[in-house]
Amino acid sequence: MQADEFFPAPVVKVLEAIQRGDETTARRLIEQGVDLNIRDTEPPGATPLLWLINTKDEKAIQLALKLGADPNFKFGTGGNCVAMVAGSQYPNLLRMMLDAGGDPNSLSGTKEPAIFNAIGEARWADIKLLVERGADLNLTDGPGRNSALYGAFINQYEVVYWLLQHGADFRIRAAVGADLAYIVEDSLSLMDKSSPQYPWALKVKQFLVDKGIKFPPQTPAEVRERWAKGEKV
């Protein structure tokens, strides 16, 4: 897709200069008032930085960041470039966004923390980088899952075990009432024992046992029933 399909002519000129590596021209146009932090008026409300990311031109992306493109600036859908590139097949992009001031706790358009994308793809470099840069492992998504609970929901138990070692709270319950103990117990009852995730699920369960969690855990239905009675669980 061409830039002029999304952005006004002055912005397109800046993007063209950036793609040529012409920092002088791009900077002059920006100093004259061209703003890189705008959204296309049509859904999904793309930004110039997002457009450059989609070209996969890392030199151009780096120059745009240097010239003031904000990795935290939200698209029309609510996400931003940090959440967009976390877990992608292009590992340099996340580091570039964070180095330019990107928020490691950015949310996607569906209100998922950026680290969830990295967990979903088991992109270890991105997971570790986000944690190194201050990602909150207990930030929750819409259904109330933190990083460890989300990882368990999608059977990424090696990642879950690592997250638990780095501060993820194993007590958090999703809005439906499920906690990590319930999810891992359910996973172990269904998972093929030859799965590479099976021994990691066992490690997660043992971690919970060592923390004093009793098995079998309460089911989500039992938890919701207690919640309905005003009881603390």
Tell where the protein language model's regions lie, with residue ranges.
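Ankyrin repeat structural motif
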Residues: 22-30, 57-65, 90-99, 123-132, ...
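Ankyrin repeat A-helix N-terminal signature
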Residues: 16-21, 50-57, 84-90, 117-123, ...
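Eukaryotic tandem repeat interaction scaffolds
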Residues: 87, 103-153
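Ankyrin-repeat boundary/"N-cap" motif
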Residues: 6-16, 39-50, 74-82, 107-115, ...
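A generic tandem-repeat structural signature
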Residues: 69-117
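Ankyrin-repeat-protein effector appendages
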Residues: 1-13, 133, 166, 175-233
